[in-house]
Curated annotation (Swiss-Prot):
Record EC number: 4.3.3.7
Keyword flag Repeat: no
Family statement drawn from the similarity comment of this UniProt entry: Belongs to the DapA family.
Designated name of the protein: 4-hydroxy-tetrahydrodipicolinate synthase
Self-association and partners: Homotetramer; dimer of dimers.
UniProt xrefs under InterPro entries: Aldolase_TIM, DapA, DapA-like, Schiff_base-form_aldolases_AS, Schiff_base-form_aldolases_CS
Enzymatic class: lyase
Reaction equation(s) it catalyzes: L-aspartate 4-semialdehyde + pyruvate = (2S,4S)-4-hydroxy-2,3,4,5-tetrahydrodipicolinate + H2O + H(+)
Role according to the record: Catalyzes the condensation of (S)-aspartate-beta-semialdehyde [(S)-ASA] and pyruvate to 4-hydroxy-tetrahydrodipicolinate (HTPA).
Domain of life: Bacteria
One Pfam family in the UniProt entry: DHDPS
Signal peptide range in chain numbering: none
Annotated positions for site Part of a proton relay during catalysis: T45, Y108
Length: 295
């Protein structure tokens, strides 16, 4: 298995007239590779995976894999709050040729820690494919605790975790209980990439990399090489732009930002709605101040 590390993008899913725009997705993927991105993560939260049909998810993942052609990692979004559905999604990622699957903790039904353990264990037993557990309690209302991550790692059920709590004490606990390099530790929070890597993280699955991929790559490289002063300067420089990517619910602002770059339309699928004119102006201003060239 390839090492799951570096600067990865939670890539948006371009849409046009209500349908997935695969041509725009290919172009976005090629641009990400040209900018130095280490991994493409389709069909995650930012990629609106939960509102794609199964056929659309397959098309998106296949398009990314065929475009990448081994030049970067592909970690396919494959989560569900039904274990049997998650298993089928991970099997699809495996069949299509992804490097790993990103599997969010089950949402809405709020399983216990034992339920979470059995969920990921069942996926592993049914697929024998590398899984990155995705812990984002702010969206799912469940928290995959370090003790459970340690159980899963010991059982070989997960290859990594995308941790989106922005809690550095949590990351230290993970390293303590699981082991520094026992699994891949990937940040799911663009605001804390530097401290996360300093606490043993191996990289990031980033939202802002959709619009500033080279800047995120440079931040990750600086942090991983021990250039803390340089990394801090880069983290601080993108702080305002980071905030504006969440001025409304993700992925609304980032899709608007990608459209402002001229790289795809900003169309969203319901129940997500376009960002307001006021929010769009804030996004545009932050992009200009960061030095991005708008279309």
């Amino acid at each position: 298995m390839r090492r799951l590390e570096g600067s990865m993008v939670a890539i948006v899913t371009p849409m046009k007239d209500g349908a997935v725009d695969l041509r725009a997705l290919r172009d976005l993927t090629e641009w990400q590779l040209a900018e130095g991105t280490d991994g493409i993560v389709p069909c995650g939260t930012t990629g609106e995976g939960v509102t794609l049909t199964p056929a659309e998810r397959a098309d998106v993942i296949r398009t990314v894999i065929e475009t990448v052609r081994g030049r970067a990692l592909v970690i396919a979004g494959a989560g569900s709050n039904a274990t049997h559905e998650a298993i089928e999604s991970v099997k699809l990622a495996k069949t299509l040729g992804a490097d790993a699957a990103l599997v969010v903790t089950p949402y809405y039904n709020k399983p216990t820690q034992e339920g979470l353990f059995r969920h990921y264990q069942a996926i592993w037993e049914a697929t024998r494919f590398p899984v990155v557990a995705y812990n984002v309690p702010s969206r799912t209302s469940v928290d995959l605790l370090p003790e459970t991550v340690a159980r899963l790692a010991k059982a070989g059920a997960i290859a990594g975790i995308k941790e989106a709590t922005a809690n550095m004490d949590r990351q230290v606990q993970l390293v303590e209980k699981v082991g520094k390099d026992a699994i891949a530790y990937l940040s799911g929070d663009d605001f804390t990439v530097l401290p996360y890597i300093a606490c043993g993280g191996h990289g990031v699955i980033s939202v802002i990399a959709n619009v500033a991929p080279r800047a995120m790559k440079e931040l990750v490289v600086a942090a991983r090489s021990g250039d803390l002063a340089g990394a801090l300067a880069k983290q601080a420089a993108m702080a305002e732009l980071n905030r504006m990517m969440f001025v409304e619910t993700n992925p609304g602002p980032v899709k608007a930002a990608v459209a402002l770059l001229g790289r795809s339309g900003g169309e969203l699928r319901l129940p997500l709605a376009p960002v307001s004119e006021a929010s769009l102006a804030k996004v545009r201003d932050a992009m200009v101040r960061f030095g991005l060239k708008l279309a």
